[in-house]
């Protein structure tokens, strides 16, 4: 399997800013080529790369005011090994978090999924969220969490993932959020999915069913959207004028929603 991905941002920086970008594929990816550039008013800048415990690659630097262009591209051959699980994961990924209020959804989760566990539970939660939410671009706010999404019954990929994660955590299944490049996604964008830990293995869950999971390519991993944002900015304001994302695969797979799949 060969996957080619790219992303491009055009921004206006209104002052001195501390910027963190999360656009690069995760560290475990088998790269055959990669390029990343940061240009402000025609001058190129180098960013510091930081890698977290899950292989998320963050590019950080300080910049002054101006028009900024960020470009990233990569080609990945083959699949990476499945994400390892460690003893810290259940502690972190069973707790409620900013956008995944599993404590608030505990009664709902226990009522809807009583008696289910393992693969059956994962399938049931995925189908339940897919059946009850409508995918409506622009229908949610960046401050919305799983509880608000459930009440609104609509959202985008991050909202679907937050609700899946919150329900699974409420049922004592460690769950986390992953930003991915998703070949086959339409309209094309950065995509967010969930991962659930069943029997010591991380399995990818996408209740939107908008792209095959087998060809998704990990970017970053965390508790919820707060941990996997493609752009973080501190100090000055900025305007994101344009965002373009592309993800293609040499042969787009067919996804069976009942099948367990791991990101690779």
Where in this protein do the model-derived segments appear?
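Secondary-structure boundary elements
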Residues: 13, 80, 84, 90-155, ...
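Generic structural "secondary-structure junction" signal
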Residues: 21, 63, 78, 101, ...
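Short, charged, solvent-exposed linker or helix-capping segments at domain edges/interfaces
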Residues: 21, 82-88, 206
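Residue-level signal for pocket-adjacent positions within structured domains
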Residues: 56, 89, 145, 200, ...
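Short, charged/polar, Gly/Pro-enriched secondary-structure boundary elements
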Residues: 79-80, 203
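Hydrophobic/aromatic-rich core segments of domains that either
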Residues: 159-237
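Active-site/ligand-binding-proximal alpha/beta "capping" segment
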Residues: 264
């Amino acid at each position: 399997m060969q996957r080619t991905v790219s992303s491009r941002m055009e921004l206006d920086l209104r002052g001195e800013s501390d910027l963190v970008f999360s656009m690069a594929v995760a560290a475990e990816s088998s790269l055959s080529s990669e390029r990343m550039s940061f240009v402000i008013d025609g001058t190129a800048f180098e960013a510091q790369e930081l890698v977290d415990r899950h292989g998320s690659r963050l590019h950080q630097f300080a910049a002054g005011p101006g028009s900024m262009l960020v470009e990233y591209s990569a080609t990945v051959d083959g699949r990476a090994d499945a994400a390892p699980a460690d003893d810290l994961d259940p502690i972190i990924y069973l707790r409620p978090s900013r956008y995944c209020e599993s404590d608030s959804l505990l009664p709902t989760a226990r009522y809807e999924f009583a008696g289910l566990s393992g693969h059956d539970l994962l399938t049931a939660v995925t189908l339940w969220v897919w059946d009850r939410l409508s995918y409506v671009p622009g229908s949610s706010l960046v401050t919305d969490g799983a509880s608000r999404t459930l009440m609104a019954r609509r959202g985008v990929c991050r909202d679907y993932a937050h609700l899946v994660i919150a329900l699974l955590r409420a049922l004592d299944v460690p769950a986390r959020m992953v930003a991915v490049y998703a070949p086959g996604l339409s309209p094309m964008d950065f995509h967010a999915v969930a991962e659930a830990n069943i029997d010591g293995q991380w399995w990818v869950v996408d209740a939107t069913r908008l792209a095959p999971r087998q060809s998704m390519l990990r970017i970053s991993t965390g508790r919820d959207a707060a941990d996997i944002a493609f752009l973080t900015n501190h100090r000055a304001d900025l305007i994101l004028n344009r965002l373009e994302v592309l993800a293609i695969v040499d042969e787009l797979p067919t996804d069976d929603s009942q099948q367990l799949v791991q990101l690779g």
